[in-house]
Amino acid sequence: MARGGGAAGVSMAHHLGIALVVLVFAAMAQVARGGGGGHDYGMALSKSILYFEAQRSGVLPGSQRIAWRANSGLADGKANGVDLVGGYYDAGDNVKFGLPMAFTVTMMAWSVIEYGEEMAAAGELGHAVEAIKWGTDYFAKAHPEPNVLYAEVGDGDSDHNCWQRPEDMTTSRQAYRLDPQNPGSDLAGETAAAMAAASLVFRSSNPGYADQLLQHSKQLFDFADKYRGRYDNSITVARNYYGSFSGYGDELLWASAWLYQASDDRRYLDYLANNADALGGTGWSINQFGWDVKYPGVQILAAKFLLQGKAGEHAGVLQGYRRKADFFACSCLGKDAADNVGRTPGGMLYHQRWNNIQFVTSASFLLAVYSDHLAGGAVRCSGGGGAVAGAAELLAFAKSQVDYILGSNPRGTSYMVGYGAVYPRQAHHRGSSIASIRASPSFVSCREGYASWYGRRGGNPNLLDGAVVGGPDEHDDFADERNNYEQTEAATYNNAPLMGILARLAAGHGARARGRLGQSLQHGIAANHTSLPHGANHQHASPVEIEQKATASWEKDGRTYHRYAVTVSNRSPAGGKTVEELHIGIGKLYGPVWGLEKAARYGYVLPSWTPSLPAGESAAFVYVHAAPPADVWVTGYKLV
């Protein structure tokens, strides 16, 4: 369990005010190497998403790309009379912990909400959406009744006693449940946040599924709010692994914020505002964001609502949230008067030895999001007689942290497995460190794994591609040893926020013009458009262009039907790259489609006789329905 993220080590000093003064932007302490193309953010993005396939539990799909994994946990929930097959293992072990899993899915969804266009341009949006759905499908199973949530499968104590592949595990698979007699407002609230955020991702491509997720979210929020309590008081076996040190106030606010964004229902904005003081949203100044402490995320979401003009009569309260968001940014930048995040000599944000990188990736994502929504504005800091930090400075600092992770550090080590020339070879991970069951099908027992595999010298036999490990200590030192779990264990919540900022950086480092996707999401429509309307301003437009027009209309049974012709073109210059694996999403469609084939999991693909689009070429399809034009967009592709 690469946890180490409890609030026990978090500075929670109440921040009473932020002075309004100006300080000229000082040069960064460390200039990252990636500004001129030193890092391949697109490759890192692809790997960061690929890692989640190594963490899958359940029946693996035909699209599985991590070939050394196989089916596992196929009886999960059976003893409890419920199907709990699926979901994700949290880190290097075989337990399904609900709190970090839900936070992981929330952050994956937020990454797509903010940077889905950029992921599509990199050809990774389809993989990102698939990773989200793997989690939400499991949560739907784990929430069989409005006031019941299965919070964990397996337990850390028995799991840590064994070193086994997930395909072989003989450890306890007991399922632990929350209900009115055994409440868990923190875990139910985080799961509500995950389902609400994910509903935005699927709103246009799969509206029925989005509705289901939103319904789960609303029920879970009501359950969390009505039956209050810490989940680790109800499920004590979780306490030593993912204890809820910060309590549940942050998750209740977090869930209400996501429900407001997903539904536009003012009740959730009212909750966010009316409970701002009582639940700590405008009281706590915190510079750490992760699976336990959600306050900075809530504060930046609330600031985003304010900046978008969605605060309504609660603008004053949301200003209080924004001041705390400013504190978080200033503390990361080292510009607060009293409470700045520490840094290593090499410039990495530093909180703790155990899995410190989780806080680096989450902070970098929050800073990038805040930067993009400031729209040329600035945050106001209280340090050094007063200072401001512009949006560009926030993004530049976030980029420096990502560059550090990818290898721009004193050791020249990439902390993403499989990226760069030097990266961890002995990740603390059961499945990666034991020969694949496909290559060596002989059963590996509980203790045999420790005797034969755990202590082996040399690299793991299976590449944990894309995994971001815990990272170096406060001196930038790192020991690539399997038993050094504080530094070499990766976790899903390390990667989830990194997906978003890698997509942002892959598209460019300058100011981001928010096109159709951003506008749609502000209205609760998660349409992953990469083909923007004519005249839309977007710095990093996709080479794939979509045009549609009505070609015929007729009356039948009192209704007017329209035939629409859609052309999909590769606008790359002559001799340029070919578009392959093109996936198309269609929303608000109420009739048949000709000229496309249904994709395996969602959306559409080009027909088998047109598998690719060379530069300058086009493909066409038509649809008929009695409605205005459908929403048509690109959800993913590869340029080769």
Swiss-Prot record:
GO aspect biological process, one term: cell wall organization
Field pH dependence: Optimum pH is 5.3-5.6 with 1,3-1,4-beta-glucan as substrate (at 35 degrees Celsius).
Cellular component, GO annotation: extracellular region
Tree of life domain: Eukaryota
Gene3D superfamilies given in the database record: 1.50.10.10
Expression sites by tissue: Expressed in roots and flowers.
Glycosylation site positions: 528
Propiece span(s): 512-640
Molecular function as annotated in GO: carbohydrate binding; cellulase activity
Keyword flag Cell wall biogenesis/degradation: yes
Enzyme class: hydrolase
Catalyzed reaction equations: Endohydrolysis of (1->4)-beta-D-glucosidic linkages in cellulose, lichenin and cereal beta-D-glucans
Signal sequence segment: 1-34
Compartments where found: Secreted
Induction of its expression: By auxin in roots (at protein level).
SUPFAM superfamilies linked to this entry: Six-hairpin glycosidases (SSF48208)
Keywords: Carbohydrate metabolism, Cell wall biogenesis/degradation, Cellulose degradation, Glycoprotein, Glycosidase, Hydrolase, Polysaccharide degradation, Secreted, Signal
Protein family membership: Belongs to the glycosyl hydrolase 9 (cellulase E) family.
Known role: Hydrolyzes 1,4-beta-glycosyl linkages of 1,4-beta-glucans and 1,3-1,4-beta-glucans. Possesses broad substrate specificity for hemicelluloses of type II cell walls. Substrate preference is carboxymethyl-cellulose > 1,3-1,4-beta-glucan > lichenan > arabinoxylan > phospho-swollen cellulose > xylan > glucomannan. May participate in lateral root development.
Protein name (record): Endoglucanase 2
Lineage of origin: Eukaryota, Viridiplantae, Streptophyta, Embryophyta, Tracheophyta
